[in-house]
Amino acid sequence: VKRGVPVIRPEARELLKTQLLLKKPKRVLEIGTAVGYSSIYMTGFLSEDAQITTLELSEERTAEARTNIKQLGKETQIQVICGDAAETLKELPDDTYEFAFVDAAKAQYIYYLPDVLRVLKPGGVIVSDNILQEGEVLESHFLVEKRNRTIHDRMREYLYVLTHDDRLETAILPVGDGMAISIVQE
């Protein structure tokens, strides 16, 4: 955590890197920019002409991300869109991206998925971060603190869809706080 802003854990970062190197995408979608750390990190494993579109709800974090991206000379490679991802995703064109990194509001992953699938090309990869919720997602609904039950239930639903939707092949990995790697079937 950097100044109270969550960033990707080192072991999760390594898995993300290997997926980028394997896929070699030209168009990447990130949901959950925060201060731009992951977007900037991903550019190190993409070709010079690859583009990242990253979505962030917070105006404050969007401004900080844009500053960080500009300071590192990545503004031509990374586009930051400020707004609710559930809405901004709807504005993105179909079959545009080869890779999606989902690392935003955990209770919203299930709501992002239909549009993520729509904007990804066949053969596209979805990497979902923080899916195990410190192990809570494996617990019974009733053992989870009341304030965390909505996140718990929605994350379980998300994982169920990832592993049961015929359009996807998914692996759930205990890396960092849990990652799912899903491939959109062609």
Which residues does each predicted region cover?
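Rossmann-like AdoMet
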Residues: 1-7
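S-adenosylmethionine/decaboxylated-SAM
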Residues: 10-186
